[in-house]
Each structure stands twice: as C-alpha cells, then as structure tokens.
A protein has these predicted regions:
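Eukaryotic basic, amphipathic alpha-helical target segments in cytosolic regions
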Residues: 19, 64, 116-118, 135, ...
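Cysteine-clustered segments with highest specificity for TGF-beta superfamily mature ligands
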Residues: 110-112, 135-219, 278-317
C-alpha cells in the first residue's frame, strides 16, 4: 500500500513538472520569443545596465514622437557600514542623491554587487528605508540567486523610498537585512542607485506613439451605461503575471495595454466590408450567423529591455509586436 502510494505521488509530481514546462514554452511561443533566460543565472553588470538602459530610453524617445521619456541618473553609495551587534544588517549611505521637488520619479532600483556565497545559494534579502534611529520601512524583499564561485549583481525596487526623499523626507540611507547571510554577502563590493526621473514637467505620456489621454478615436466615454464597442484601459504589470521568466524584463515594469469591449449594434463601426456583410446576414438569420464582436482593429508594438536569453550578462532592446490596443471595431 505504502509503495503504491509513493509511486502515485512520484507520477503526479512528474506530470505537474511537464505541465509547468509546457506552460512556459506556450508563453514564449505566444509572445513569439525564442527563449527566456534562466533567472537564477542572470548577472548584468552596472556598466552594461547603464549603457543599455540609455539605449532603451533613446529608442523610446524616437518611437514616442517626443512625448516625455525619463532620464537615467545613477548614484554610487558613499558609505557602506555594518551593524556592530547584528552581522546580518548593512547600511548604505546615498547622501549625494540630490533632486529638486519639480522632478518626478518613474523607477528607482538599488543594484548591489555581492561576493560569492557557499552557505545558502538563494537567501532572502530585505531592503529597508531608514526613517530614524529605530524606525524602518520595508521597500522590497526577494530571494536572490548567488554563486559559489563568482560575485553577482542583484536588483531591488526602492522607488517608494527615493520618492519620499524627493517629497522632503530625510535621506538617512538604506538598510539591507539577511538572516541567512554571512558578513561577506552583506558587504557589497559595489552599490548603486539607478533612477529613472523626469527632470522637467512631463507632458501627457503613454507607452505608445499615440496620445490616448487626449481622446483616441475609439476610446470609451466615461458615464455611458451601455457602452458600444470601444477601447478600455488596462494596465499590465509584468511581475503580477506570476510567470518566473518574465522577471528578466528590465523595462518597462508596466504598460498600458488596453482591451476592447462593448456592444456591436447593426451598422456600427465595422472593421471591414466582411464584417458589414456578416452584420447584414446576421440580421436576416440570427441562428445561422453570429453577431460581429468588438475586437482590436489597430495594434502597436512595445519596446522592451530584457536580459539576453543566450548571454545572461547582457541586455537586449527588442520590439514586441501587437502588444498594445490602439483602436477597436466590430469584426
């Protein structure tokens, strides 16, 4: 009985693993990608990050028809200190971070270079904003994948902390905590803040060359009870999709994808002549032919900065086709 039970468990585990692999492959295929990198092996240097982030931002400026695009600013830690009584606590000082109140933060990442680590290859590191001598605020927490033979770069989201400095809170630095780490891991060889910031008042912007906020041709009108086919807003945040490989996307963290929904009454906003004919035939015989449906009629690509799937130390700027809905029609 016991042997049969464990055999069933082993079989179920094997089938589940196959299902996960197939799901990942399907996700790659649906996006038209050849591969995703192994996130446990990603190790992008600060020089490579800075170079390719600026290339990505330049690409955005060209594709967005001069709509506001942030600038990249980097600040190295001036001080790295260790808590005298707690070996698993390290403090980073960034007193040189100077920004005016007119600036606006898009994204702020703390990137640290940590030494090789044998004891626990995947410890959990917590990042805190220091508010006072006794108060801390958690900014980010993640499992990092270290190497037993080489130093590795790790990245953390500290946007809310840097934004609070911009709004007048005292800049007392950032604290790293890792109960599973030893001193060598929490003594970063290098620590850098990489900040995407709007240095001038930003104009209307979205991640496309179209200015939706001023009203697209098929954008939905707020307050309409029974909306006809129109474009609704839909913000997609990549980390919320719960697909491990998608964490290799560096930028954008999120984007406005949009979707189509609404009624398609007779002779309303047809996408093609075929949809007009289908609408007429449906009116004659509703059982034989379905009503036309609200669907995207114009799509746009998305510029993406992500880890090279074949060289985990490099970044690529890519254009992913058909990622954003621009207009909707009955089809």
């Amino acid at each position: 009985m016991g042997g049969h039970f464990w055999a069933l468990i082993a079989t179920w585990t094997f089938l589940c693993s196959i299902r996960v692999v197939l799901a990942d492959e399907s996700f790659e295929q649906e996006l038209g990608l050849s591969a995703f990198p192994d996130v446990t092996k990603v190790n992008v240097s600060q020089d490579e990050y800075t170079r390719m982030m600026r290339t990505y931002l330049h690409t955005l400026r060209e594709s967005m028809d001069n709509h506001s695009v942030p600038e990249l600013q980097t600040f190295d830690a001036e001080t790295i200190t260790w808590h005298p009584k707690k070996k698993y606590v390290t403090r980073l000082g960034f007193s040189g971070v100077s920004m005016s109140s007119e600036m606006e933060i898009e994204q702020a990442d703390l990137r640290i270079l940590v030494s090789s680590f044998v004891d626990a290859p995947s410890p959990t590191i917590k990042i805190y904003q220091i508010l006072s001598a006794r108060r801390r605020r958690l900014l980010d927490e993640k499992v990092v994948y270290l190497s037993s033979t080489a130093s590795k770069w790790c990245e953390f989201d500290v946007t809310s902390g840097v934004d609070s400095w911009l709004k007048g809170n005292r800049n007392l630095g950032i604290e790293l905590q890792c109960a599973q780490c030893n001193n060598s891991v929490l003594q970063p060889l290098q620590a850098t803040l990489s900040i995407l910031v709007y240095t001038t008042p930003k104009r209307v912007r979205r991640s496309s060359p179209y200015n939706y906020e001023e009203g697209g041709r098929t954008d939905c009108i707020n307050g309409e009870k029974r909306q006809k086919c129109c474009r609704h807003t839909m913000k997609v945040t990549f980390k919320d999709l719960k697909v491990p490989q998608i964490s290799s996307i560096i930028q954008p963290k999120s984007y406005e994808a949009g979707f189509c929904k609404g009624r398609c009454p007779y002779n309303y906003n047809h996408a093609t002549n075929h949809s007009r004919i289908q609408s007429l035939v449906h009116k004659l015989d509703r059982k034989a032919v379905p009503r036309v449906c609200c669907a995207p009629s114009k799509l746009a690509p998305l510029d993406v900065l992500r880890v090279d799937p074949y060289d985990y130390t490099k970044l690529n700027v890519e254009k992913w086709d058909n990622m954003k809905v621009l207009e909707c029609a009955c089809s």
